[in-house]
Amino acid sequence: MENMKLNNNLECPMLGLGTFMLSPEDAYTSTLEALKMGYSLIDTANAYVNERAVGRAIKDSGIDRKNIFLSTKIWASEYENENTVEETLERLGVDYVDLLYIHQPAGNWLAGYRMLEKAYREGKAKSIGISNFEGKYMEELETKWEIVPQFIQVEAHPYFTQKELRVTLDKYGIKLMSWYLLGHGDTALMNELVFAGLGKKYGKTPAQVILRWHTQMGFVVIPGSKNAEHIKDNMDIFDFALTDEEMEQIAKLDKNERYYHRTDEQLVQFANWKPEFEK
């Protein structure tokens, strides 16, 4: 496993397990399997409604808490709930998280960010981040933060490399964590000839080549799966390295086109939707 150093000197693994769309049962099993395989980064969120399951898996793994990098996200409807950080920690069964995000630039997101800064100062979050903040939202936050975030979690893949956003990220040393990292199941991306060719050269699948591309771009990857073999395969990407020429080949695929298009109406819905947390 490779690690990266954040702008506050904390170290974070380059690859972890994502739990988006996993039921509590699957999140528990996948988290436990991943930790046993050697994963240490686990990513969840209030809105995934599986934080308790992830927390149970961490406890049942028997792995020392300090050797796990736990990431979660505060949902938009919780930004004005002054107890939400403590409630999130309670669901996870931990005293702190290694990375705490606000999930969407919806509702009173500035109050949400102030909550992150407070959690960071109090040691309840070892690092903080923003999820889905791009364009005007990133520009506004840049003028209002008191503590620079360590991470941003956004859509990124070879068809959409976030060139414009990365100019701002590089200025502050903010790291990017990718979602839709394999193209959201787009067979066109997975079937690009360059990945088949490189897979053949290195004895890897196209998915493994794409994951390796992410890490060599400096992106942290959190592929999710409830399949133990896939979880294992996703980790098997650090025994080869793409050459500069090969990275340039992949760079030519960039269309600056995203899969997910969020609307202002959705942001309003996000601010009003309350997750039904596990009991």
Task: For the regions a language model picked out, list residue spans one by one.
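Short, acidic/polar
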Residues: 22-34, 78-93, 111, 136-139, ...
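A short, structured active-site edge motif that brings together acidic residues
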Residues: 65-78, 98-105, 132
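Beta/alpha (TIM)-barrel catalytic core signal, keyed to glycine-rich beta->alpha loops juxtaposed to Asp/Glu
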Residues: 104-279
